[in-house]
Amino acid sequence: MPSTRVLVADANSTDGTPDIVMSFADRLLVEVIPGGLPSVGRNAGASRADTPYVLFMDADIEPASPSLIRRAVELAASKHLHCVTTNILCRGGSLTDKLLYASNDVFQYLSRLHRPFATGMFMLFDRRRFNELGGFHEQVHFAEDYLLSSRVERSRFGIVRGGVYTTNRRFEKMGHFRVAKLFISTALNYWNESFFLRDHKYWQS
């Protein structure tokens, strides 16, 4: 891990994130770079990568197993996959929170039959294929992860066993009904890029 380059895209945070990140510089090859909305920050990090794979992870998630990242890379390499994701787990949330995240996981597995869906919380990409696809669409402010992963061939998409822990913060801010409605609308509009380009006020919530 000390030789693994970690790039943290910071969108002008005011909570001391850059200082916290750099406090690990004696143990990790870490760097803070200018960020923005998720698609902008992720593309900025990917443009600096020179490895065969690039892993996108949200700042508020935690791998459920220390071996998760290693297993994701091994799965991608052994099966020549272009994109690998994992299950999303909610620790400490309500039963409704857990059910909605479980529904997300079920949708991910079913997506392998139609159009792959990977959440940006944990998305391992073959860097060459990522660049060929043009990266994340920077004019899309919601579900940019789904829009990109849906362009991956089904045979090149995988889900590694295990998962990452996340919080119920988005449910608390937006409400379960609105999040579920937006998720379903997104799934039904997979073919309609103009839907993704609309302002769904996701980040204003």
Roles of regions detected by a PLM:
Residues 66-95:
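Conserved donor NDP-sugar-binding/catalytic core segment of glycosyltransferases
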Residues 88-95, 106-125:
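A recurrent flexible, glycine/aromatic-enriched loop bordering the glycosyltransferase active site
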Residues 142-148:
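Acidic donor-binding loop at a coil-to-helix junction in glycosyltransferase catalytic cores
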